Structures are given as C-alpha cells and as structure tokens.
C-alpha cells in the first residue's frame, strides 16, 4: 500500500478555540491511524544540517522553512491513494483545530 508523509501545522490558540468534542474525535482519528500502522509523532526542536561538497558539517538551530503556524507533528500513513490519504488526515487534530496538514506521497528509492 502506498505511504504518505504528513506534516501538521498548528498552535495552542487554534487548539483551544476548537470545541473539546471535536478535539476528542480528532485524537480518536490519530488512534485509528496508529492502529492501521501509522508512525505519528510530535515535532521537537528543529536543526538544519548542511555539508556542502562533503567538506564539513554545519548545524543551525531552528527550522529552514518559515510558516504562519509552527510544525506540530509528523506522520507516515498508509493509504490507497492521495484521495484516501486526504480523507484520513482531514480528521486529525491539526486539520480540525484551525491548522493545516500537508500530505506528501512517499516515493521509495530503489
């Protein structure tokens, strides 16, 4: 089955202004995805790693991409196709609590 990488963006304000019952249903969707084999995690502090021309590693604290909302979490999910992946993540906490979820097809290298 195809795999998809999801990146959830959201913040505390959006989470708190969402009704508790909607948040609970969204957390239940996370549980369903875990039962289906998804790897789900909350984002920690990001670092940027560079090694131009393999001549030396440089590490910078903080994310490379700047967005209106912080990255809240990541998941790798199984879905039949992109439409199925979208349907699944449309019910997770970041999507429901005024955030956004990006869905990226995972193209496995051979």
What are these regions (language model features)?
Residues 1-110:
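Conserved, structured core segments of small domains
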């Amino acid at each position: 089955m195809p795999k998809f990488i999801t990146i959830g963006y959201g913040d505390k304000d959006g989470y708190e202004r969402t009704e508790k019952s909607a948040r609970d249903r969204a957390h239940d969707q996370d549980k369903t995805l875990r039962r289906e084999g998804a790897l789900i995690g909350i984002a920690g502090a990001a670092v940027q790693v560079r090694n131009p021309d393999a001549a030396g590693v440089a590490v910078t604290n903080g994310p490379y991409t700047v967005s209106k909302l912080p990255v809240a979490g990541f998941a790798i999910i199984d879905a039949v196709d992109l439409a199925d992946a979208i349907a699944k993540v449309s019910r997770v906490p970041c999507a429901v609590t005024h955030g956004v979820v990006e869905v990226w097809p995972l193209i496995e290298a051979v």
